[in-house]
A protein has these predicted regions:
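ATP-dependent carboxylate-amine ligase
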Residues: 2-168
């Protein structure tokens, strides 16, 4: 995992998931935002990554790429499954207030801006955003450009759909 910048008090990290078996060991242990970037060809990588993020106590997930809504839905299903398991084991009602919040963004730039500036948890301070890049073509360069723009007052467009710019 590589630190690629900072926005206000949040440190921004980037990790390429594809062909990188070590990525999961570098994730924070708690209180962090996952900004996921996944496209159709990355679908098989999402389920195990969602489980790992949940195991690492992710506080918020913001999903982008052509699989944004599917990725968000998968995180929601993982949360629900864990809640069900908790209720079956403890015979107590699960407190969804302690669950991660999930969002999907068809506008890539807006999603990154949201993850780095607005995503929050009322109960804990979030000071890390980890960009989990599932793609073959990589978006690291685009993310570093967005960090500079956001730090200089840039706001995302109102376009409903805006795709990522890829490194290659």
């Amino acid at each position: 995992m590589e630190r690629i910048g900072r926005i206000n008090r949040r440190k921004i990290y980037y990790v390429q998931i594809r062909n990188n078996t070590e990525w999961k060991f570098s994730l924070p242990k708690n209180d962090w935002v996952a900004f996921t970037i996944a496209n159709k060809e990355d679908e098989q990588l999402v389920p195990p990554a969602a489980k790992i993020c949940m195991d690492k106590n992710v506080s918020y997930t913001c999903s982008a790429g052509t699989l944004a809504h599917w990725t968000e839905q998968y995180f929601d299903e993982e949360i629900t499954g864990r809640a069900f398991d908790y209720e079956m084991q403890t015979k107590q009602e699960f407190d969804y207030e302690s669950s991660p919040i999930t969002t999907a963004h068809q506008n890539f730039n807006e999603g990154f801006w949201f993850a780095t500036t607005l995503a929050h948890d009322a109960h804990k301070e979030i000071d890390k955003v980890v960009c989990l890049d599932f793609t073959k073509r990589k978006v690291k360069k685009h993310l570093t450009e967005l960090i500079d723009k956001i730090n200089n007052g840039w706001l995302p467009s109102d376009e409903e759909i805006e795709l990522a710019e890829y490194d290659n």
